[in-house]
């Protein structure tokens, strides 16, 4: 909506490209032989949760920006003015949508032929794992809160800026706790989104 393009088409395209970038393969262990086999055509549930959060955000940004660029360059199917607006919007999204899907598909094929194997592995190794290590530590939490207040002192909404980067990390850590709890194990993370909501952000940033 900010870019004055079809928000519904852009949102749907973000979902489609995320699924396209996700490898539809799951490892299955045969109970009788304990042998692990790769099953094709199955949605990996793990990548639909915290593991796929960063990938979903990055793919959504890429697909939206690419869609916006193509639409604003008028690379679309133009319909006569007598055609209803809903039909016009549908046809206008066809060419940009096809181009975006093709770009993401080619990107996936290229990455699958590297040592990484998938976009999820790249994001996990380069971005998510380092941020998770930082975000899960006490010093990381302290630095994040201090940075929030430094930004506020400059007249910038610090919670929004820092939260935009770190919230996916803390939500991911919270989801790891959920998985461990459901499995009857000790929860591994103290610093999570709930930790900030209960002990730091009550009444405002820094317990104001």
Where are these regions (language model features)?
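Cytosolic juxtamembrane amphipathic/interface segments immediately preceding
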Residues: 79-89
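Pore-lining transmembrane helices
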Residues: 1-70, 76, 91-208
């Amino acid at each position: 909506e900010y870019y004055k393009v079809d928000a519904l088409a852009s949102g749907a395209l973000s979902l489609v490209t995320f699924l396209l970038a996700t490898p539809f393969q799951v490892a299955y262990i045969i109970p009788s032989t304990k042998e692990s086999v790769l099953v094709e055509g199955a949605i990996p549930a793990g990548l639909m949760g915290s593991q796929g959060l960063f990938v979903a955000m990055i793919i959504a940004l890429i697909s939206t920006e690419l869609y916006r660029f193509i639409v604003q360059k008028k690379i679309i199917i133009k319909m006569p003015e007598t055609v209803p607006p809903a039909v016009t919007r549908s046809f206008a999204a066809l060419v940009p949508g096809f181009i975006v899907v093709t770009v993401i598909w080619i990107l996936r094929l290229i990455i699958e032929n590297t040592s990484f194997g998938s976009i999820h592995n790249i994001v996990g190794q380069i971005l998510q794992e380092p941020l998770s290590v930082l975000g899960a530590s006490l010093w990381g939490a302290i630095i994040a809160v201090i940075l929030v207040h430094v930004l506020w002192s400059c007249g910038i909404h610090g919670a929004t800026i820092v939260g935009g980067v770190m919230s996916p990390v803390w939500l991911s850590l919270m989801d790891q706790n959920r998985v461990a709890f459901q499995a009857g194990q000790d929860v591994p993370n103290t610093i999570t989104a709930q930790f900030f909501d209960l002990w730091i952000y009550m009444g405002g940033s820094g317990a104001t």
